[in-house]
From Swiss-Prot:
Annotated keywords: DNA damage, DNA repair, DNA replication, Ligase, Magnesium, Manganese, Metal-binding, NAD, Zinc
E.C. no: 6.5.1.2
GO biological process, one term: DNA repair
Protein name (Swiss-Prot/TrEMBL): DNA ligase
Lineage, highest ranks first: Bacteria, Pseudomonadati, Pseudomonadota, Gammaproteobacteria, Enterobacterales
Domain BRCT: 593-671
Binding-site residues, Zn(2+): C408, C411, C426, C432
Naturally occurring in which organism (per UniProt): Salmonella schwarzengrund (strain CVM19633)
Length: 671
């Protein structure tokens, strides 16, 4: 066997292994970028020796064979994959190939859309009624997931409108919004269930359940992006026209679809989407660029596994492989001890990553992680990098177990893990320097007391020099004392003192959030402030009374009650008030006198809003007598669903709660 034959055999075997893990087992072991690199290497070798290309080479087919647990559906029109480009130069080369093949010097009109990171499916409608659905599988044969797809509320069981074809097969992506993914994992950690590495794995695992009742509980959604079978009807002669027609028939289509009349316009779209990526609420890994004209698509045709008229322009990889060199333990403001992996530095999504959170002891056990392991690191948007999985097939011989500390690594106090909780905590309280630092950093943060110019390094020095022990001590600082800190001149010191003085005027909700009560985030703090109105009323509340507040259950109510029952906490609050911290007296709203459909209602916002910010929407709703909650419960009267609404929308539908969209909310606000 020639050396190149050996290389080809090894590459094909490796790629088939990873295709099986990705497409069949929903448990990928390597990042997409590494798979793409291996595929490029195989293509390049096959280009050198086309006589060695085999029919079953991964370059000649799509995906992997389907699971035998599902019935199989043969695709009458193959579900092909897309070729990829990874930089501007490669895209411009693709654009030129298209123009050359069309023998045209004029710019092609491109239809650009999002490349969703979910599971490709085909859905067949006969006379407008959903009759079957299948996964991509190997592109020729997929798995019959009809029963599961019927549980996805975004997918219509019957199309509506005129001129619906007798047989119409739509293609699209089933995916899981970020909020739904976090809720699934949160529930799994609480119940000891399977924790998913990323939303794509969660979507695939949810869609390919043998029991559709499990799928029905998962907040999956769907966007349509193409067509397979078309019989007994017609569709528009452009890709965008077809998407708009699908939308008119009731099929969900992404609103981020744009026509571009030049290569530069495509690049602008790519960069704008890349910038907006962290705020979309769901995962994408690039944009898809298609020739808009169906006539030109037919003229361009296909290669073995992909169309010549479309390409996926992928973003820089958000996942990379590296090694865990050590694990250290950090202490947070509530005493939570968090293991942090120290990594061999690696570039991920344009950022050099050398640390990744490991969350807790359960996560380390779930991963089966040891120091020295080769791991996959993921960094999405502004999220702290995390270890996705261990590459067990490449585990080095010299690895060692991770041992959780029995004493606080900062103050030496005992650590404890309360039954039913995943977190291990230091019991040292404010005698622990780490907890003191983190509590003060939280207190001055932008969404809390918002002390401009007081960064982490200043807090670190103030605690280390014992200038500050409690939040009230901050307001006693003088410019003279601050000037003694590193890199703090007289002008900067005075600016910090001025910022502290300005921060004394706050709101009741911000003040509560700044106190750092366990489990009390911004939304809960706002709910407590709105419900009780005054600090005195809140401090006097019983656990039962606290649970009357939207989103406050027994756990949160107990934490709030215990916080105010602690004499040292009441003392700190008294000192803060004595130093001049204040907020406006509550405005008593008589909902009986407000003529608004929102008056007296408990309202939940979910998804992203396009017409106004979430804060503005909350403010207007509260002004009209509504109580804005952060989660859906039986107490909820109304849910307002924006784009990419996730688990909250699903729960509202399960509970039979009224749901309106953003347009209807604005109409009612302006009524």
């Amino acid at each position: 066997m020639e050396p190149i034959e050996q290389q080809l055999t090894e590459l094909r075997t490796t790629l088939r292994h990873h295709e099986y893990l990705y497409h069949v087992m929903d448990a990928p072991e390597i990042p997409d970028a590494e798979y793409d690199r291996l595929m490029r290497e195989l293509r390049e070798l096959e280009a050198q020796r086309p006589d060695l290309i085999t029919p079953d080479s991964p370059t000649q087919r799509v995906g992997a064979a389907p699971l035998t647990a599902f019935n199989q559906i043969r695709h009458e029109v193959p579900m092909l994959s897309l070729d990829n480009v990874f930089d501007e130069e490669s895209f411009l080369a693709f654009n030129k190939r298209v123009q050359d093949r069309l023998k045209s010097t004029e710019n092609v009109i491109w239809c650009c859309e999002l490349k969703l990171d979910g599971l490709a499916v085909s859905i067949l409608y006969e006379n407008g009624v959903l009759v079957s659905a299948a996964t991509r599988g190997d592109g020729t044969t997929g798995e019959d997931i009809t029963s599961n797809v019927r549980t996805i509320r975004a997918i219509p069981l019957k199309l509506h409108g005129d001129n619906i074809p007798a047989r119409l097969e739509v293609r699209g992506e089933v995916f899981l919004p970020q909020a739904g993914f976090e809720k699934i994992n949160e529930d799994a950690r609480r119940t000891g269930g399977k924790v998913f590495a990323n939303p794509r794995n969660a979507a695939a695992g949810s869609l390919r359940q043998l029991d559709p009742r499990i799928t029905a509980k998962r907040p999956l959604t769907f966007f349509c992006y193409g067509v397979g079978i078309l019989e007994g009807g017609e569709l528009p002669d452009t890709h965008l026209g077809r998407l708009l027609q699908f939308k008119a028939w009731g099929l969900p289509v992404s609103d981020r679809v744009t026509l571009c009349d030049s290569p530069q316009a495509v690049l602008d779209f790519y960069h704008n989407v890349e910038k907006d990526r962290p705020t979309l609420g769901f995962d994408i890994d690039g944009v898809v660029i298609k020739v808009n004209s169906l006539a030109l698509q037919e003229q361009l045709g296909f290669v073995a596994r992909a169309p010549r008229w479309a390409v996926a322009f992928k973003f820089p990889a958000q996942e990379q492989m590296t090694f865990v060199r050590d694990v250290e333990f950090q202490v947070g403001r509530t005493g939570a001890i968090t293991p942090v992996a120290r990594l061999e530095p690696v570039q991920v999504a344009g950022v050099l990553v050398s640390n990744a959170t490991l969350h807790n002891a359960d996560e380390i056990e779930r991963l089966g992680l040891r120091i020295g392991d080769k791991v996959v690191i993921r960094r999405a948007g502004d999220v702290i990098p995390q270890v996705v999985n261990v590459v067990l097939s490449e585990r080095p011989e010299e690895t060692r177990p991770i041992v959780f500390p029995t004493h606080c690594p900062v103050c030496g106090s005992d650590v404890e893990r309360v039954e039913g909780e995943a977190v291990t905590r230091c019991t040292g309280g404010l005698i622990c320097g780490a907890q003191r630092k983190e509590s003060l950093k939280h207190f001055v943060s932008r969404r809390a007391m918002d002390v401009d110019g007081m960064g982490d390094k200043i807090i670190d020095q103030l605690v280390e020099r014992e200038y500050v022990h409690t939040p009230a001590d901050l307001f006693r600082l003088t410019a003279g004392k601050l000037t003694g800190l590193d890199r703090m001149g007289p002008k900067s010191a005075q600016n910090v003192v001025n910022a502290l003085e300005k921060a004394k005027a706050t709101t009741f909700a911000r003040f509560l959030y700044a106190l750092g009560i366990r489990e009390v985030g911004e939304a809960t703090a706002a709910g407590l402030a709105a419900y009780f109105g005054t600090l005195e009323a809140l401090q006097a509340a019983t656990i039962d009374e606290l649970q009357k507040v939207p989103d406050v259950g027994i756990v949160v109510a107990t934490h709030v009650f215990n916080f105010f029952a602690e004499e040292s906490n009441r003392d700190v609050i008294g000192q803060l008030l004595a130093e001049g911290v204040h907020w406006p007296a509550p405005v008593v709203i008589n909902v009986q006198e407000i003529d608004s459909p929102f008056a007296g209602k408990t309202v939940v916002l979910t998804g992203s809003l396009s017409q106004m910010s979430r804060d503005d929407a909350k403010a207007r709703l509260v002004a009209l007598g509504a109580k804005v909650a952060g989660s859906v419960s039986k107490k909820t009267d109304l849910v307002i669903a924006g784009e990419a609404a996730g688990s909250k929308l699903t729960k509202a539908q399960e509970l039979g709660i009224t749901v309106i969209d953003e347009a209807e909310m604005i109409r009612l606000l302006d009524a």
